[in-house]
């Protein structure tokens, strides 16, 4: 199977998000890469589901709460930007302060 660099990046994010979901389900606090992957995957999947950029900007803030991540992680993520594939093309989605 041949994958483009973009497809490899998406697959890596999805794999890291699966690991983060499992750790979160076990009650573990997520670290920086796990938190970013989980929020990013939620945005990418929402785009594929047909949600608008505005909806995803709002939804991205509800993926994780401060008590679900390790100390200091929320402050390390002021913004998350993801190029997501929508039914009408690729768009940049920016979520400001994703972990409240």
Curated annotation (Swiss-Prot):
Extent of the signal sequence: none
UniProt xrefs under HAMAP family: Urease_gamma (MF_00739)
Reactions listed under catalytic activity: urea + 2 H2O + H(+) = hydrogencarbonate + 2 NH4(+)
Location relative to the cell: Cytoplasm
Subunit structure: Heterotrimer of UreA (gamma), UreB (beta) and UreC (alpha) subunits. Three heterotrimers associate to form the active enzyme.
Coiled coil: none
Pathway noted in the entry: Nitrogen metabolism; urea degradation; CO(2) and NH(3) from urea (urease route): step 1/1
Source organism per UniProt: Leptothrix cholodnii (strain ATCC 51168 / LMG 8142 / SP-6) (Leptothrix discophora (strain SP-6))
One Pfam assignment: Urease_gamma
GO molecular function: nickel cation binding; urease activity
One GO-annotated biological process of the protein: urea catabolic process
Top-rank lineage group of the source organism: Bacteria
Gene3D superfamilies assigned to the protein according to its UniProt record, in alphabetical order: Urease, gamma-like subunit
Keywords: Cytoplasm, Hydrolase
Sequence similarity: Belongs to the urease gamma subunit family.
Protein name, UniProt field: Urease subunit gamma
One GO term describing the cellular component: cytoplasm
Classification via InterPro entries: Urease_gamma, Urease_gamma/gamma-beta_su, Urease_gamma_sf, Urease_subunit
EC number assigned by the record: 3.5.1.5
